[in-house]
Amino acid sequence: MENVVTPDQGRATALATTLSLLVGWFLLSVWLALHDPFGAPGQPPFGIAIILAVPLAVFALDSRLHGPLFDGLRRLDLASLIAVQAYRIGGVFFLVAWRAGTLPGAFALPAGFGDLAVGLSAPFVAAAVAARRRGARALAWTWNIVGLADLANALFAGVTHSRSALGVFAGSLPSDAVGRYPLSLIPIFFVPLAILLHIAAMRRLRAAPASP
């Protein structure tokens, strides 16, 4: 008798495949973080550009071809895609590094408080979406846009306050510590992951305009 895959089985398989990919990506990120992928001072920040571009390109291609790599992510409901970004409270480590004198406030304060705000609000926005409260769709759009803007601002501040060729605002205390392990895991893994989650959430919002 021919085996029939139920929707629940298909979803479980897709989630397992995507989770395996994320674990492998994280382990690769740890290896990269331990091997200084951002280059020497004074050089263009090609490292961060590649680290951001590769997962985004793979995600775009996989989505275009309806591939299996990120199918689990695409199958998550909107509330789950938002709730998982509670991990952004990890931005508190930027504030700890600032207090310790290893990161400049011009970078650490907006990046740290921005991530904290996004991470702390994620469960509440997700709950509003799951309960289909009035205005939840607009709230979800706003939250995703603010979350992406926070990431863009942090990347801009990190690069321009570094000792790279684009470090036009670098002072006596550059942002180079964020390029060293363990802080480097944030731009290497957690920032690209957050971008993918925002994109997946906004695609779901756009696909279901009447009911997020």
Stretches with model-predicted labels:
Residues 140-157:
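Hydrophobic alpha-helical membrane-insertion segments
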Residues 5-21:
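N-terminal membrane topogenic signal
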